[in-house]
């Protein structure tokens, strides 16, 4: 039977007249229905670990907008929590974790095969979604890349320059490499379990890849992504992988060939014309509208959306933002973006 899900067709290399569309953080605080469900859950982590409510918020933007893909509602920091790190969220400050700064901290982490005990509700969310999503909607699972997750585990929070992680990488490379190896192995198991539960695509979010330069980018962004991708493809032939080395700049060039990912997601620091010439030549790209347009809307949103669609029209393209949609976005601007992509 011919594949009917537009996202999967494009990930297989097909060029469509109208690209499939979804948004990073499409289940989020900009939607009133999300805010109501989150209030019902009590807090963010309780929402992540409640399969029925997590499935509900995943479905909300599909009901409202008819996106071509749903992305599992979860968080990249559930993996360190499953490995034994303490995780909590401070109001107005974002995530906080117990820190990894010495060998003794690392030694307290759980083995990789212990993560499923904590993460089993996430897999149940996937199973619910496979039953409830429309037949034309693809389901995307995801995880954070080892480098990005490590930056939070080392600093205990998000940092503007990932300084603590760079300091450990340079000052105690053996410990840092051991942490990256543990996270790489855990990410393989986590994504594999999502696929076994029903995810049809997986995405690896390397939000802080851009702070790695030269050999460090190769060793800690590119190589772990390649290891994860190769392991998943060996276990689950035919499951596409999207890589997102955010703000990689020139590092986007050749990333798909070097890692084996089926699609490279782009942030909006690179222009569509440049990316079409230098990245899309290797296959599918995803992106890359600035999320600020979801706040401001208007003709600028329409014009930029059309420019991106046109720039990537010669090859496989998934329309998306260059970063997650923000809480102050206007839901009507999301509809305007979708209408522009689908109707021209």
UniProtKB/Swiss-Prot annotation:
Molecular function per GO: uroporphyrinogen decarboxylase activity
Presence of the UniProt keyword Transport in the record: no
InterPro entries xref list: UROD/MetE-like_sf, Uroporphyrinogen_deCO2ase_HemE, Uroporphyrinogen_deCOase
Annotated SUPFAM superfamilies: UROD/MetE-like
Site (Transition state stabilizer): residue numbering on this chain: 75
CDD domains referenced in this protein's UniProt entry, alphabetically: URO-D
Localisation per UniProt entry: Cytoplasm
This protein's pathway: Porphyrin-containing compound metabolism; protoporphyrin-IX biosynthesis; coproporphyrinogen-III from 5-aminolevulinate: step 4/4
GO CC terms of this entry: cytosol
EC number(s) stated in the UniProt entry for this protein: 4.1.1.37
UniProt keyword Isomerase, yes or no: no
Keyword vocabulary terms for this entry: Cytoplasm, Decarboxylase, Lyase, Porphyrin biosynthesis
Cross-referenced Pfam families: URO-D
Enzyme class: lyase
GO biological process, one term: protoporphyrinogen IX biosynthetic process from glutamate
Positions with a binding annotation for substrate: 25-29, 75, 152, 207, 323
Catalyses which reaction(s): uroporphyrinogen III + 4 H(+) = coproporphyrinogen III + 4 CO2
Predominant subcellular localization, coarse grouping: cytoplasm
Functional summary from the UniProt entry: Catalyzes the decarboxylation of four acetate groups of uroporphyrinogen-III to yield coproporphyrinogen-III.
PANTHER family associated with the record: METHYLTETRAHYDROFOLATE:HOMOCYSTEINE METHYLTRANSFERASE RELATED, UROPORPHYRINOGEN DECARBOXYLASE
UniProt subunit comment: Homodimer.
Family: Belongs to the uroporphyrinogen decarboxylase family.
Protein name as it appears in the record: Uroporphyrinogen decarboxylase
């Amino acid at each position: 039977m011919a594949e009917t899900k537009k996202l999967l067709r494009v990930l297989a290399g097909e060029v469509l007249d109208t690209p499939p569309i979804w948004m990073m953080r499409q289940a989020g605080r900009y939607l009133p229905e999300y805010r109501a469900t989150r209030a019902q859950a009590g807090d963010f982590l309780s929402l992540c670990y409640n399969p029925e409510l997590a499935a509900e918020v995943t479905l909300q933007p599909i009901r409202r907008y008819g996106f071509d893909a749903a992305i599992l509602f979860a968080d990249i920091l559930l993996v360190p929590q499953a490995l034994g790190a303490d995780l909590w969220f401070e109001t107005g400050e974002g995530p906080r974790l117990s820190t990894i700064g010495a060998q003794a901290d690392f030694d307290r982490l759980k083995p990789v095969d212990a993560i499923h005990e904590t993460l089993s509700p996430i897999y149940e969310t996937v199973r619910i979604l496979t039953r409830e999503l429309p037949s034309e909607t693809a389901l995307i699972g995801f995880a954070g890349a080892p480098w990005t997750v490590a930056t939070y585990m080392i600093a205990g929070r998000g940092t503007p320059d990932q300084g603590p992680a760079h300091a450990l990488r340079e000052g105690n490379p053996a410990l840092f490499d051991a942490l990256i190896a543990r996270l790489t192995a855990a990410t393989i198991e986590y994504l594999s379990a999502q696929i076994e539960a029903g995810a049809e695509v997986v995405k690896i979010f390397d939000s802080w890849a851009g702070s790695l330069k030269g050999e460090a980018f190769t060793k800690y962004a590119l190589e772990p992504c390649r290891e994860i991708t190769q392991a998943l493809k060996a276990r689950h032939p035919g499951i596409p992988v999207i890589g997102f080395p955010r703000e990689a700049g020139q590092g986007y060039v050749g990333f798909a060939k070097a890692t084996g990912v089926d699609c490279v997601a782009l942030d909006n620091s690179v222009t569509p014309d440049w990316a079409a010439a230098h990245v899309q030549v290797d296959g599918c790209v995803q992106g890359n509208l600035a999320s600020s347009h979801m706040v401001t809307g208007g003709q600028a949103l329409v014009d930029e959306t059309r420019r991106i669609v046109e720039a990537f029209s010669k090859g496989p393209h998934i329309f998306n933002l260059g970063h997650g949609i923000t809480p102050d976005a206007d839901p009507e601007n999301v509809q305007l973006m979708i209408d522009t992509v689908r109707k021209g």
